Every structure is written in structure tokens, then in C-alpha cells.
């Protein structure tokens, strides 16, 4: 009794496989022949499997003859119902094999679409039937199959997976070649413009994907794609390469490159859609790479040649298409960037050369020409090249090159001509005139100026000229707009930092302080003896304004009183300060009483001093005027030239050509009593030519001096931090530190090093060639 209980402790009955198999087999046959099945019949089949799996068998019957029993963890052989299933599993496997062997006979002689229709239809039916069978065998899967797999037995699968493995071995492998070839032929037909039944391909692909079972894990989720990759994708990619190699070569021989690019673009989109419609998504990247290699990379040289043609012809749409294609190739854009940089550089040089000498003295023409080139190619980079950083850099390099070195800089024999012309253009925008644009337009134009400013190498030159011109605008009160002036200084500060604009901002402050000072002086005059003329003053801090001290000058007695009253007033407010008068920048108004009409003359202080002499006499020699005004002869001659040209004064020979007459000490100059002018207010305060030239020379001289100081300061800063440095390293660091202001010339840096050695800031290291050390 005890023996019986150990073999069948719960009194379960023993069911032999033969007892259920005929009915189970008939039911499975019904499933695979797609006959309708009632739910009750399905449950009968399920119950057959369940009853068999839960019946009691001897362990050797459970496993089947010749199969060694599995060992439990304790080395014991578990017996009983746990292991019932192997015989059923083997019968199911045999059934599937026989079913597919018979099915293969119907398809093995088919080709092309016929084999695809056969394969996809049978696959769909088989897949569905196998899922039904998997449900019928659910208990077998959960218990016997799961336990076998857990114990590491190979070649045992969940029933649905077993069905797939059997399909793979018995139907897929024999038909694989003709099915894959049929799929590839169908794809080629579609590439050639024919309409195809894409469901045939997607059906095959779906089958290939699902057949990629994970052999190591019968219950693994998702396929491994091995079958799909090896049996289809590798051949598909090779086919793709052959097809497009032939097509691209033939198309390029018969059509322009622009048409080829459209074709390539269309083909790439087609292949992308192909994956979406009927291939596996994992093929996307491989297929794209293959197409890009064949359609683009192999023809890069042709693209490079065409790129230049498209630039020359301004074919922006085609350039954009080329960019989109070539950007798909790794490092493919390098050559296009170089070609673009060279092209923009050449276009910039040609545009400036076309302006000729006119641009040398016409800042507006020069800057506008530069901006036109930049605007054109900036728009190209944004629209055609997607504002790609590499193409933006090519634009920047090209603009930097042609702006700092072109026909105008060569004519001027100075690379500093560009910043000077840009500063003069700013002056023309910010100076009061009848042509001043509206505020919004002016702001937009100043933004455009900053575009050019970005590319200027010698920013210190721009700053010097800009400061000179700003100073004159402020002193002569002819700024178009204080807001625009402040806006421009703010833009420069943003671009170059506080130090770059500190003097410009100080100038503004001085003008504000001077307004308050004038109010205080007027108030002071009302409380004491008033002046008998209008008088205003600007007090400028000497370190911030780019003006030189005044030359010798004897103030006319008519102006002496104003001068003395203000000097005394200022001294009472600021006892420690000394005023230095800039007569060359001062101006005033004179009213005439000696001509037919009464005129108001707007004149410089020097002009006033000369004209006031004629209150006493009608004629003076040049020497007499020099003695009475104390103005140096070279400056006096220029002032007299302007007065002679305005016809207020005349030479003794009234018909003589003023430009051709050399003024000598004994030259007699008379007041012209027949003076006439259509205007009653006449501005005779025009700049002197030699004064402008001298100013320009002084500015350039100051720039060179300032540069030397900046270079020396940079060297000291670097050496203080590094202590010891090789010559080449020092040069490199100086160039890096100062490149945002200007490009220092190497000979000047060397000279500055020598100066600092003399001043004992540095010394040469003994025994080491070209090495310097810092002296604390």
C-alpha cells in the first residue's frame, strides 16, 4: 500500500497519450485547416492536454525512452505528474513537421509573385492556427515546458515558438531563396515606377522578423532579427547599392547636376518611406547610409565643382539642396565651407575694387558696399545652409579678410583705413543734417555698423577716430540725437567692454556737467554786474577728450571781460583746478554794421579775432594781423584763406585768384565793403584742410604710441603670471590677449620686450636661448 501511495498519493488516474491523441490530433488538424470550431470543442481539446499533463506516470514514461532524468537541486529525480509532457510535445512537433512538409509541396515550384502570395497567405494562416494551438497547450507550456527550460534543457520551446521553429526549418529554409528573390524583384519594380502589392513584401518581412527566435530563452520577449538580417536585409542592401550605382552614373551622364540633386533627394525620401511602409524599422539607418554613400559620397567631386557654379549664378535653392544632401556625409561639408569662404572673399574684394578711388573718401559708399556683400551671403548662409555654424564661420573669416585688406586699404597704404572709414560713416549718421534718418531707421543702421565693426581687426583705430568725431559733435552741439549717441556707445561697450568706451562715456558726463555750470554762471551774473553779450562755456576733463592744447592766441578785448569773469567764477568753485582754454574749438557770432545788409556771421574765435580788427581800419598787412592776434603764421594763413574765399576780405588786387596767391607778411588784406549774401545768417566756420590732415596724422601717431603701451602692459601682465617664458610662447600670448583690440606686429612686440628689459621689468635667462624671466 505504501508503495502505491508514493507513486499516486492523491489517487489521480493514469491517462495514456494514445487514449487522447486521436481526438486531439483531429482537433489540431481542424485548427490548421482553418475549419470553424465551437468553444465547447476548443475546451475539449484543452481538457485533453490538461488531463494528460496532470495524470500520473512512471518517470521514465513521463520523459520518454532514452531521455536521462533531470536532477533536482538535491540530486534527486523528481517523479510524478510534474514531468508529464514530453511524449505529447514530441507528437505535436511531429504533427507540425508533417503538416509543413506536405504544405511545402504546393509551394516549392512557385516563383516571383506566386511564391510570395503562397508564402504570405500560408504564413498568416499558420501563425493564427499556431496561436490557437498555443492556447490549447497552455497548461503544457506553463508547467512541463517552463520546468524543462528552467532546468536548462535545450531545444524545448513554448508551443507557439515550436511552431515557428518548425516553420523555419521545414518551410522557410527550403523556400527562402526564391521568396527573398521575389521580394527584391518586386522592390526593383517599384523603384522603376511600377505599382506593386506592398502587402506581399510586408507579410514576408513580418514573417522573417518573427522567425528570429531567441534560442537561448524560449520565453524571451521579442525576436532577435537574426533571420531578417541574414536572409533578407544583407541581400536587400547589396541590391540597393547595385541599383543606385547604375542609376546615378547613367543619370549624371545625361542630366545636369541640379537635376541629379532633385533625383537623389526624391530617392532618399522614397527609401525612407519604403522602410515605413513594408520593411523593419531597424533597416532605416543602414539603408540611409548605403543610399547616401552611393548617391552622394561617390559623387562628391562633381558636387564640389557644381557648388562653385551655383555660387557664381546665385542659385540659392540649389545650394540649399546640395547642402542638405552633402550634410548627410560625415565630414562632407569641409570642402564646401572652404569654397564658400574663398567665394565671399573674392566677391568682397571685387565689390570694393569696383568702387575705385571714390570709396577712399566716401565712407557711406565704402561701408554700404561691405554691408551689401555681407547681407547677401548672410542671407544665403541662413536660408540655404541652415545657419550651420561651419558656414557662419566661413562667412566671418571671408568678411574679416576682405574688410581688413582690400583695394581701398592698399590705396591708402594702411590696413587702418577700414576702421577710419567706418568711424567717419558713424559720424555722418550721428551728426545733425537735413538727411538724418528717423530714429528707428537710425538704430537699424547703427546695428548694421556693428556688423562691420565685428570684423574690424584694428578696433583701437576705430575708437580713436570715433572719439575724435564724437568730441567734435558734442563740443559743436551738432549731434542728431543724444539717444542715438548713447545707444551707439552702449553697443560698443557690449562688443568690447567697459574700458573701450570709458572715455566716450566721460565725454557725455562732461557735457551734462557743463550745462549745469552754465546755469550756475548765468545765475551768478544776475546777482552781480551782467555781461553785455551771450556767453556759454564747456569745461572738459583733460584726460578724456582727444584735444590738444591751444596754440598762441591773443583774445580780442571785446571777449576779454567774459573770459575773466568766468575764470574768477570757476576758481571760486574749484580752487585747485586750472583751466586751459581751447581757442581753436571756440566759436561765436558777429553782427555786421558795415555792409548794405545787416548779417550775422557764425565764426570761429580766430575768425572773430581777425574780423574785429577791421572795426578800427579797413586794411591790414598779414604781419599786422599776426602781431595783433598772436596766431601762428601757418594757421593764420588758413584762416585768412577762408575769409578771402567768403569775400568778406579781399586782396589788394581784388581780381587775383585766392588759391594761387601766397600770403606774405607784407600782403595787404582789406575789408570788402561790397559784400553780399542771399542769407542773413552766414556760417563761415568751416574746417581747415591742413588742420584735418594734421589731425589725421596726429591720430595715427597717437594710435602707434598707445599700442606700444598696451603691448608693454600685456607683456608685463603675462610675465608676472608666468614668471619664465620662451620667446615664441610670449609672442603667442600677447597676440591672443590683444587680438580683440588690434593685431600687433611681431617687430613691435620685440621692440617692446627690449624696452621692458631696459626698464628692468624682464631679463634674458642666462644659458637659455630666447627665454625671459620676470623681475619683481
UniProtKB/Swiss-Prot annotation:
Family matches, as SMART domains: CULLIN, Cullin_Nedd8
InterPro entries linked: Cullin, Cullin_CS, Cullin_homology, Cullin_homology_sf, Cullin_N, Cullin_neddylation_domain, Cullin_repeat-like_dom_sf, WH-like_DNA-bd_sf
UniProt pathway annotation: Protein modification; protein ubiquitination
Name used for this protein in its record: Cullin-1
Tissue localization of expression: Expressed in lung fibroblasts.
GO MF terms, alphabetically ordered: protein-macromolecule adaptor activity; ubiquitin ligase complex scaffold activity; ubiquitin protein ligase binding
Gene: CUL1
Protein family per UniProt: Belongs to the cullin family.
Residues joined by cross-link Glycyl lysine isopeptide (Lys-Gly) (interchain with G-Cter in NEDD8): 720
Organism: Homo sapiens
Amino acid at each position: 500500500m505504501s508503495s502505491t501511495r508514493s507513486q499516486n498519493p492523491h489517487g489521480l488516474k493514469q491517462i495514456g497519450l494514445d487514449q487522447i491523441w486521436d481526438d486531439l490530433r483531429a482537433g489540431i488538424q481542424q485548427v490548421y485547416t482553418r475549419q470553424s470550431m465551437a468553444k465547447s470543442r476548443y475546451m475539449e481539446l484543452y481538457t485533453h492536454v490538461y488531463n494528460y499533463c496532470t495524470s500520473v506516470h512512471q518517470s521514465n514514461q513521463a520523459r520518454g525512452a532514452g531521455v536521462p532524468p533531470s536532477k533536482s537541486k538535491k540530486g534527486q529525480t523528481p517523479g510524478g505528474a510534474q514531468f508529464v509532457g514530453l511524449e505529447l510535445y514530441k507528437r505535436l512537433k511531429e504533427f507540425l513537421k508533417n503538416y509543413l512538409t506536405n504544405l511545402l509541396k504546393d509551394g516549392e515550384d512557385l516563383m516571383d509573385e506566386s511564391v510570395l502570395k503562397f508564402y504570405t497567405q500560408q504564413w498568416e494562416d499558420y501563425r493564427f492556427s499556431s496561436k490557437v494551438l498555443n492556447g490549447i497547450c497552455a497548461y503544457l507550456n506553463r508547467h512541463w515546458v517552463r520546468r524543462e527550460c528552467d532546468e536548462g534543457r535545450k531545444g524545448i520551446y513554448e508551443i507557439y515558438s515550436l511552431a515557428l521553429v518548425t516553420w523555419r526549418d521545414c518551410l522557410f529554409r527550403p523556400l527562402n531563396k526564391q521568396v527573398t528573390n521575389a521580394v527584391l524583384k518586386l522592390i526593383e519594380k517599384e523603384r522603376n515606377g511600377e505599382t506593386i502589392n506592398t502587402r506581399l513584401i510586408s507579410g514576408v518581412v513580418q514573417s522573417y522578423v518573427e522567425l528570429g527566435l531567441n534560442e537561448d530563452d524560449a520565453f524571451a520577449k521579442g525576436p532577435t532579427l537574426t533571420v531578417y538580417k541574414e536572409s533578407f536585409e544583407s541581400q536587400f542592401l547589396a541590391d540597393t547599392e547595385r541599383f543606385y550605382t547604375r542609376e546615378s552614373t547613367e543619370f549624371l551622364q545625361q542630366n545636369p547636376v541640379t537635376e541629379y540633386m532633385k533625383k537623389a533627394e526624391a530617392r532618399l525620401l522614397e527609401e525612407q518611406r519604403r522602410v515605413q511602409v513594408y520593411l523593419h524599422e531597424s533597416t532605416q539607418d543602414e539603408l540611409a547610409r548605403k543610399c547616401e554613400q552611393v548617391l552622394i559620397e561617390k559623387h562628391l567631386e562633381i558636387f564640389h565643382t557644381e557648388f562653385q557654379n551655383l555660387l557664381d549664378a546665385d542659385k540659392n535653392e540649389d545650394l540649399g539642396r546640395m547642402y542638405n544632401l552633402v550634410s548627410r556625409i560625415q565630414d562632407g561639408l569641409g570642402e564646401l565651407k572652404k569654397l564658400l569662404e574663398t567665394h565671399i572673399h573674392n566677391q568682397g574684394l571685387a565689390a570694393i575694387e569696383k568702387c575705385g578711388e571714390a570709396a577712399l573718401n566716401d565712407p557711406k559708399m565704402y561701408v554700404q558696399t561691405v554691408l551689401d556683400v555681407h547681407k547677401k551671403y548672410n542671407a544665403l548662409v541662413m536660408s540655404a545652409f541652415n545657419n550651420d555654424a561651419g558656414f557662419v564661420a566661413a562667412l566671418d573669416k571671408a568678411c574679416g579678410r576682405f574688410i581688413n585688406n582690400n583695394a581701398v586699404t592698399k590705396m591708402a597704404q594702411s590696413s587702418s583705413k577700414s576702421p577710419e572709414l567706418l568711424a567717419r560713416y558713424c559720424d555722418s549718421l550721428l551728426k545733425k543734417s537735413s538727411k538724418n534718418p528717423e530714429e528707428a531707421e537710425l538704430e537699424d543702421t547703427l546695428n548694421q555698423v556693428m556688423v562691420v565693426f565685428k570684423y574690424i581687426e584694428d578696433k583701437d583705430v576705430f575708437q580713436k577716430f570715433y572719439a575724435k568725431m564724437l568730441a567734435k559733435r558734442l563740443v559743436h552741439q551738432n549731434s542728431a540725437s543724444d539717444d542715438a549717441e548713447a545707444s551707439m556707445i552702449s553697443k560698443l561697450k557690449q562688443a568690447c567692454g567697459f574700458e573701450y568706451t570709458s572715455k566716450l562715456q566721460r565725454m557725455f558726463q562732461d557735457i551734462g556737467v557743463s550745462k549745469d555750470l552754465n546755469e550756475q554762471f548765468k545765475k551768478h551774473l544776475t546777482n552781480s554786474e551782467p555781461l553785455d553779450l551771450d556767453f556759454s562755456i564747456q569745461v572738459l576733463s583733460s584726460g578724456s577728450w582727444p584735444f590738444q592744447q591751444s596754440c598762441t592766441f591773443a583774445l580780442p578785448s571785446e571777449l576779454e571781460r567774459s573770459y575773466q569773469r568766468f575764470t574768477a567764477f570757476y576758481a571760486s568753485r574749484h580752487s585747485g583746478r586750472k583751466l586751459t582754454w581751447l581757442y581753436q574749438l571756440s566759436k561765436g557770432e558777429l553782427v555786421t554794421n558795415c555792409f548794405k545788409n545787416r548779417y550775422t556771421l557764425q565764426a570761429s574765435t580766430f575768425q572773430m579775432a581777425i574780423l574785429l580788427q577791421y572795426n578800427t581800419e579797413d586794411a591790414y598787412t598779414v604781419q599786422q594781423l599776426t602781431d595783433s592776434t598772436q596766431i601762428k603764421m601757418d594757421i593764420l594763413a588758413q584762416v585768412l584763406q577762408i575769409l578771402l574765399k567768403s569775400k568778406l576780405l579781399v586782396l589788394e588786387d581784388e581780381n587775383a585768384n585766392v588759391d594761387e596767391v601766397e600770403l606774405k607778411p607784407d600782403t595787404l588784406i582789406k575789408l570788402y565793403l561790397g559784400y553780399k549774401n542771399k542769407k542773413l545768417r552766414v556760417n563761415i566756420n568751416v574746417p581747415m584742410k591742413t588742420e584735418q590732415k594734421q589731425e589725421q596724422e596726429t591720430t595715427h601717431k597717437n594710435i602707434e604710441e598707445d599700442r606700444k603701451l598696451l603691448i608693454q602692459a600685456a607683456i608685463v601682465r603675462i610675465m608676472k603670471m608666468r614668471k619664465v617664458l620662451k620667446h615664441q610662447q610670449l609672442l603667442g600670448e600677447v597676440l591672443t590677449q590683444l587680438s580683440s583690440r588690434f593685431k600687433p606686429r611681431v617687430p613691435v612686440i620685440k621692440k617692446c620686450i627690449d624696452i621692458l628689459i631696459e626698464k628692468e621689468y624682464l631679463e634674458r635667462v642666462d644659458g637659455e636661448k630666447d627665454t625671459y624671466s620676470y623681475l619683481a
